[in-house]
Every structure is written in C-alpha cells, then in structure tokens.
Amino acid sequence: MNIEEFDYDLPESLIAQTPLKDRDHSRLLVMDRETGEMKHLHFKDIIEYFRPGDTLVLNDTRVMPARLFGLKEETGAKVEMLMLTQIEGNDWEVLLKPAKRIKVGNKLNFGNGKIIAECIKEMDQGGRIMRLHYEGILQERLDELGEMPLPPYIKERLDDPDRYQTVYAKESGSAAAPTAGLHFTDELLTEIKNKGVNIAFVTLHVGLGTFRPVSVDDVNDHEMHSEYYQMTQETADLLNDTKSKGHRIISVGTTSTRTLETIRRDHDKFVETSGWTNIFIYPGFDFKAIDGQITNFHLPKSTLVMLVSAFSTRENVLNAYKTAVNLEYRFFSFGDAMLII
C-alpha cells in the first residue's frame, strides 16, 4: 500500500489558523461508515446521532506549556526546547532548535536557572534526552516559563491558550491537543448525558510524532512513535458493560481510538491498565473496540488519514475530504469535525 494513495489536494486557505468563537459552532460532516453517504450539520447537532446507552470516550490529557526558550550555558547561544515525553523521573525526550551543537554533557538554562536541562543522550531528527533540574514542582515552572506548543501549520499567535485545551483536560503530559475534543462545551456534554449517553475518560499523552510526516513509500514499512496511555477500572467496567448490552462505543479522536483498540487487542476486553502504545491502524485493521468515531480533518498522507480510512474505506474518506474541500470546511487542529458511524 503506497503512501501516495492517502494524498489529497488542500488549498492552504482552508487550514484553520484560529478557533471559532464558539466551540460547538464548527461544522460537522457525518459519514456513514459503510456506504460513505454524507450529511452536513453543525457540531452542536451531533447529539441527534447518539442513543441512550451509548458510551462516548474522551481523552482527558492536558497540553503542557512545553515550549521553552533559553540559553546554552557554555556559549550563551539561544536555544528552543520542546518537551515531548517524560521517559523516567526527570528525564525527558525533547526536540531542540538548533540541535546540532547540543552534545551529551551540555547544559541549557531557562528562566535564569529556574530550569536547567542537561543533555544525556543524542537522538535523530533533533531529538535529545534531557535531565531536568529545578526547584519545586515542574508544572509550576512550565506554567511560569513555557509557551503552548502549537502545530507547525498554525502560523498565528493564539490569544487564549485555553482554546488549545479541551474543556475536560485534566492529566498534564501532551505536546499537542486531542483536537476532536475541542468542539465540546460543558453545556453540550450535559445535554449528551441527559439523553442517557455515558461519558467515559481515557488518557493518552499526545507526542509530536503525531505531526511527523511518514518517510517511507510503503505504508507497511512505517514505524509509529510510542505514546503513554492509561485506563481506570471505572472506565473499563463502563465500556465492558456497554459492549455486553449491545450498545455502541464512540471514540472522540484518533488518540482515544488508539487507546481503546490497544487495550482490546492486548486483553480481549477493557481492563485497568497503563503503558506505551505504538499501534499503527491502517486499512485492513480489525476494529474490536469502537463503533463510531469523531475526528477532525487530517493532513494528507498522514497516519491519521490512514486510521480513519481503516474505519471506513479509503475511497469513502477521500471522497468525504474532497467534498469538504469543495464546501470550504476548515481543516486540521482548529478546523471542523467528522462523525463516522
């Protein structure tokens, strides 16, 4: 399966640079998973497609203000550090700009010594493992010194950083937002609950691998980045009960989908668990967890386009994307949404 099969034409003008004033006023393209038939609504109308007994699964990860600007201690040269993943203790996988001159043993100084980062391992593509030294609580230091790490295709400054967080974000650890969840408001979630729909949470901390382009021609040769996930016993019990009663599980975002499918693949049911997943979902994948999913419109030739193609068909998804382009839907993180069901 060639990567070019997941390409599509997207005018740059359709890449949303800012969020809409009201989260749930974004547009919603509803696509039948089997037939590819489409309907065009607004996100707040999504409640029409939920049934009592369904369970909606949200990723409650919180984006860290993980972009730091500092100096190389030895030379005073300016450096930018983007924190990606906590490896263990105070050791983090990071991306550095410029990275070339940062070697093992070099130290970076942020906020006049409030955070010192020491390089302990060099990796490819500008990656490093850095050991952080700081006083107090890391989250407080990041809140003080860091900036929100917006995706590279968003060029405009974000006036309100909370707009790149879901309203239910709780577990800090992501380098990017689970963007399908950005459309929900507290009021809409209350309406959904009042209809008899269950709300469940999982956590998957989104790494920057989400934005890294696939660098191989043959999709089968691609290796996914690993991301940390966890599921509580409460969520596991609710999802198992949903399945046993013949109701539907609808995931919000590809991150929730990857978490749910990882756990069902590894355990044959939902269990309390945590770990790292590099599950790669592309056409031919056998879905065991979800019955529907909400997702944004993704980058051409990305693993996320492959995931949604696997849930329906490549032809259905690319036809929906072509329709969305023609109707001038907004694309990517701050863009509009799809419901595939």
From Swiss-Prot:
Give the EC number(s) listed in the UniProt record: 2.4.99.17
Q: Which GO terms describe its cellular component?
A: cytoplasm
Question: DNA damage as a keyword?
Answer: no
What SUPFAM superfamilies does the database record attribute to this sequence?
QueA-like (SSF111337)
Please give the biological process terms from Gene Ontology that the record holds.
queuosine biosynthetic process; tRNA wobble guanine modification
Indicate the quaternary assembly.
Monomer.
What is the protein name given in its UniProt record?
A: S-adenosylmethionine:tRNA ribosyltransferase-isomerase
State which gene encodes it.
queA
